Amino acid sequence: RSSAASDVYKRQDYMVTTKKRLSAFYPTDLELLLRNLGIRRVVLTGCMTDCCVINTAFDAANRDFRVVVPRDLTRGSEHLEEPALRMISLHLGLVVDSEALLGEWRSQKE
């Protein structure tokens, strides 16, 4: 794990939900959970950028969540990872480096 991922996992206020299909939103209670917690932005990480991450990004954007994908905390097929990240950046949300995202979070705490 990168140091950025380690920083995120140190937090005690995160929840884990089990993904059953290509999107974390289907068929789960994730949307209900996020809405009940008042969460409007989702940060997506994981493997299969060109499949599961992008499917979850589409579903999140279609449900009016703001999508952020840390490019260094995802992995995909060799030839499809970068095109998937470009598609997310063009149509679905923000693609950033995890250190920049953590820096933004830290500055919001101050």
Q: Where does each model-flagged region fall?
A:
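A short glycine-rich beta-strand->turn/loop micro-motif centered on a GG-aromatic cluster
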Residues: 43-47, 66-78
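Alpha-helical scaffold elements lining the catalytic groove of polysaccharide deacetylases
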Residues: 18-43
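Single conserved hydrophobic/aromatic residue that forms the stacking wall/gate
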Residues: 1-5, 9
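Anion (oxyanion) recognition and catalysis
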Residues: 61-62, 89
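Active-site-proximal loop->helix
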Residues: 76-91
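Short glycine/serine/threonine-rich phosphate/pyrophosphate-binding segments
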Residues: 50-56
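Residue-level detector of anion-binding/catalytic polar loops
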Residues: 40, 66, 94
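A charged, well-structured terminal subsegment
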Residues: 17, 94-110
